[in-house]
Amino acid sequence: MLTINASPNAPAANSQLMGGFWSGVSQLSTGKKRGAIGQAQMQLVQQLLAAELNASAFGSIPATGSFAAWESAFCGTNANAVKNAQQQAASFNSQGDNSTFTPGTSADSKFARFIANLLFWDKYTN
């Protein structure tokens, strides 16, 4: 389970969830380069987090793949499995691109970046 505290007075770097979205794919927060599998894992985690949120918000389920399979690929070291999971999650996330839904509030990218815990995702370095 990932942490998120998005209250208006939330402390900096408290949100592991936002850290997943804002962490660099090719580099760690320290500037060190991620390896090929680490980069693929970070591409997957951004799609996977979005997919989990989309499923929760809209009640949708993937047509191909599954959250369990994508999470398993993320935790593994098979680059092809990670890339396949990323493609499936990205496809799932784009299924509703042409749908109409009631908009919520505007996003606040500055605050989202402020609360993002980037260090949490530095462990994916391979």
Task: Annotate each language-model stretch with its function.
Residues 1-126:
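Soluble extracellular-acting proteins and domains
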